[in-house]
Curated annotation (Swiss-Prot):
Gene Ontology cellular component terms for the protein in this record: cytoplasm
UniProt name for this protein: 3-hydroxydecanoyl-[acyl-carrier-protein] dehydratase
Subcellular location: Cytoplasm
Function: Necessary for the introduction of cis unsaturation into fatty acids. Catalyzes the dehydration of (3R)-3-hydroxydecanoyl-ACP to E-(2)-decenoyl-ACP and then its isomerization to Z-(3)-decenoyl-ACP. Can catalyze the dehydratase reaction for beta-hydroxyacyl-ACPs with saturated chain lengths up to 16:0, being most active on intermediate chain length.
InterPro entries: FabA (IPR010083), FabA_FabZ (IPR013114), HotDog_dom_sf (IPR029069)
Amino acid sequence: MSRQHAYSREELLATARGELFSHSNARLPNDPMLMFDRITEIYADGGSHGKGIVNAELDIRPDLWFFGCHFLGDPVMPGCLGLDAMWQLTGFFLTWSGATPGYGRALGCGEVKFTGQVLPNAKLVRYEIEMTKIINRTLVIGQANARMLVDNREIYFAKDLRVGMFNSTESF
């Protein structure tokens, strides 16, 4: 299977509608919950574990929806949205790599550290996901370590992010 190694926002939104990958029913969230504007690189054999990498970016603008409500008079991007982006990208990697059809769900993570914040005057958030383990049995599970950088400064780190691909989510 020939795969792209970068994706535009339009292609990511096509994934939200179920139009990009014919082999899977996994989807990214639609706006406004899609937390990145583009995937700049995705490879199946990158990273220190040789399991693959995904790098993505979000352009920061003062008019992004979350700055208007979190918090009034003290706008900051909620930390959970950056963490969710890391799970979104881990799930996207599983679908991109040919994981069996399924619905992606975040399963947890081993450790999360926040050492900074995203303010409206920032310019760019970059996500760097490094796959550490892929289990491809009845249930497909991807595990990754991830960093989030704002204007080239690391502010979030997550270890052992886990995403599962479920044939049905009714009993989840």
